[in-house]
């Protein structure tokens, strides 16, 4: 077991400056034994997996992939912290696929994610990367037919990705057998280990074989989460990014001062006219606000789509499909969208409401400049929000300036 003291020591950690196009000036504070593997070819991956990786469009591993994949494949417990858009999902997906015995038709890896959408995205990514391996992978998520889950699991799945509640339900019903599980992956661990999911994760963990390897991946890892990892990780390797480097480079952040809540809507309409947007996401803090704003925008003849956690699964899926394809250009959403959902064309994020906690800020704005693409984030700030904005600035050691008149030129 690693102790908290070991976690905190910088003696066993060194800082590395990476000089890569899209990862300039990101300082890793990383365990000594982590080395860099610059190409997929030199990672010792199976041939059919390499084919899948190149067919998927990957050419060169990202900074996190160069460090984490080999460690995970070696069987080490790993805490990997990487910003949104750096390829962290592919990091554990490639590692999981490498470790499977395809001949054995039993669940060998379990991936937990905080939202249904993210679980489905992970499943699709695994199937695409494992295209030449004949891998079976099922997304086990709430809001879908339990009978279908049971049928799929009975058929035999090498990997199960899912939300903690439904996964635990399937384990309890003995539909998801855990005896062959070798690896547990917690994606977006900061969100997962927040109060809501902590108990469910422990419930699932108790059913896993004692030697199960644990991999924890997230954009932010607050101190209290590192403390919790002590409970179920053994001597984990750390691959961490310093917190104050976490705001993505290439994303310009601005604020617009709106004295009162009522003024936000007009501000949004004014912006909408100014910006010939490729694709944008507008974040609100509540489902009710998402519905209200969507209706109001449509009344004003703006075309928008919207999504939040109360919508039926099918509806959310078709909205995401529409948005990904570019058929809808502006999406109004709650934080359900902020977690790891991958739409490369998004170049503008508007925080209609500042997020309720500062950890969420990076998940939201990390959307808009994926894989080193440029992006713009605009925060609507009421008089009594100034304090929250300053807190976010301080927390991420970043600067958020007042929005200039020529903001359209920056997108």
Curated annotation (Swiss-Prot):
Lipid biosynthesis recorded as keyword = no
Q: Where does ATP bind?
A: 60, 65, 85-90, 342, 367-371
Its protein name is Eukaryotic initiation factor 4A-III
* Cross-link Glycyl lysine isopeptide (Lys-Gly) (interchain with G-Cter in SUMO2) per UniProt, renumbered positions: 19, 152, 314, 374, 382
Instruction: List the SUPFAM superfamilies hit by this protein, alphabetically.
Output: P-loop containing nucleoside triphosphate hydrolases (SSF52540)
Q: In which tissues is it expressed?
A: Ubiquitously expressed.
Q: What is the effect of changing residue 273 to K?
A: Loss of CWC22-binding and loss of incorporation into EJCs
Question: Which lineage do the record's taxonomy fields give for this organism?
Answer: Eukaryota, Metazoa, Chordata, Craniata, Vertebrata
User: What sequence ranges are listed for the domain Helicase C-terminal?
Assistant: 250-411
Q: What is its main location?
A: nucleus
Q: Where does motif DEAD box map?
A: 187-190
Q: How is it regulated at the activity level?
A: The ATPase activity is increased some 4-fold in the presence of RNA.
The record lists its disulfide bonds as none
Entry keyword annotation includes Protease: no
């Amino acid at each position: 077991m690693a102790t908290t003291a070991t976690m905190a020591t910088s003696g066993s950690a060194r800082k590395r400056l990476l000089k890569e196009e899209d990862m300039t000036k990101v300082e890793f504070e990383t365990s000594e034994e982590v080395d860099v593997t610059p190409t997929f070819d030199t990672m010792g991956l199976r041939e059919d997996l390499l084919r899948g990786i190149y067919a998927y469009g990957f050419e060169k591993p990202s900074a996190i992939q160069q460090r984490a994949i080999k460690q995970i494949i070696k069987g080490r417990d790993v805490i990997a912290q990487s910003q949104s858009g750096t390829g962290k999902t592919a990091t554990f997906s490639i590692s999981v696929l490498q470790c499977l015995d395809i001949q054995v038709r039993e669940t060998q890896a379990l991936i937990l994610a905080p939202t249904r959408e993210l679980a489905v995205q992970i499943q699709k990514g695994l199937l695409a990367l494992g295209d030449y391996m004949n891998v079976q992978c099922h997304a086990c998520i709430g809001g879908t037919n339990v009978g279908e889950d049971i049928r799929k699991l009975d058929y035999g799945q090498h990997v199960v990705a899912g939300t903690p509640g439904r996964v635990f339900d399937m384990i309890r019903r003995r539909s998801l057998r855990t005896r062959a599980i070798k690896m547990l992956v917690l994606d977006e661990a900061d969100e997962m280990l927040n109060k809501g999911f902590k108990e469910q994760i422990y419930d699932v963990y108790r059913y896993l074989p004692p030697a199960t390897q644990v991999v924890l991946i997230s954009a932010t890892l607050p101190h209290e989460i590192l403390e919790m990892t002590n409970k179920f990780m053994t001597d984990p390797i750390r691959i961490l990014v310093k917190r104050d480097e976490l705001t993505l480079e290439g994303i310009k952040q601005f604020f617009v001062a709106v004295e009162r809540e009522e003024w936000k809507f007009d501000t949004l309409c004014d912006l909408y006219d100014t910006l010939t947007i490729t694709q944008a996401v507008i974040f609100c803090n509540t489902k009710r606000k998402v519905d209200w704003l969507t209706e109001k925008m449509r009344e004003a003849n703006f075309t928008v789509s919207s999504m939040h956690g109360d919508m039926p699964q099918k509806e959310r899926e078709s909205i995401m499909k529409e948005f990904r394809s570019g058929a809808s250009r502006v999406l109004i959403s709650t934080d359900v969208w902020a977690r790891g959902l991958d739409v490369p064309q998004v170049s503008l994020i508007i925080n209609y409401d500042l997020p309720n906690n500062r950890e969420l800020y990076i998940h939201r704005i990390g959307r808009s400049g994926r894989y080193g693409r440029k992006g713009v984030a605009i925060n609507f700030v009421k008089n009594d929000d100034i304090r929250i904005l300053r807190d976010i600035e301080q927390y991420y050691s970043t600067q958020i300036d007042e929005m200039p008149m020529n903001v359209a030129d920056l997108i």
